[in-house]
């Protein structure tokens, strides 16, 4: 026989499930992002991708993370130029990839909360070639809205890969971040 205490305990545990329903704001955010990203993908221009990245990505967070140990070397007067350079870098990457990986459609799956209180949203990307990719999006809360902090494709973090590229570039230039800023803003 189920006791009242057991039933109340089950209800309490069930109500704090880490998986969000389809109407959760993080899912609505990802639906808007998906629609805009697919439109950018179909157009394939750097400018269209830049608009989507500026609207939905945590540009400052991604940019700062990408500097790794060289973050203290970024001067305050370089910051906005660097952030814009990162947007351009990511936009060029996505525009280039859009030619090779033609997306037919996407599905937004469930969202859950990780140990750092970030929201992780699962998605599936369907290519025109018939291939599919699972992408896990990490969302963070910034200035009253969700922002994309990372995407993992086949288990590989895009921000981690970008960090590797940037820190390697800076390392070869003896820690001079201004050379990276100049390269990103050409």
Indicate residue ranges for each PLM-predicted region:
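Generic alpha-helical secondary-structure signal
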Residues: 10, 82-85, 183
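Sec/Tat signal peptide C-region and signal peptidase I cleavage site
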Residues: 17-21
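Early exported N-terminus immediately downstream of N-terminal targeting peptides
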Residues: 23-98
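Juxtamembrane/interface motifs at transmembrane-helix termini
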Residues: 68-71, 100-105, 168-170
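Surface-exposed, charged secondary-structure patches
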Residues: 92-133, 183-186
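Short beta-strand edge/turn micro-motifs at domain boundaries
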Residues: 132-160
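Low-complexity, intrinsically disordered terminal/linker segments enriched in charged
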Residues: 150-186
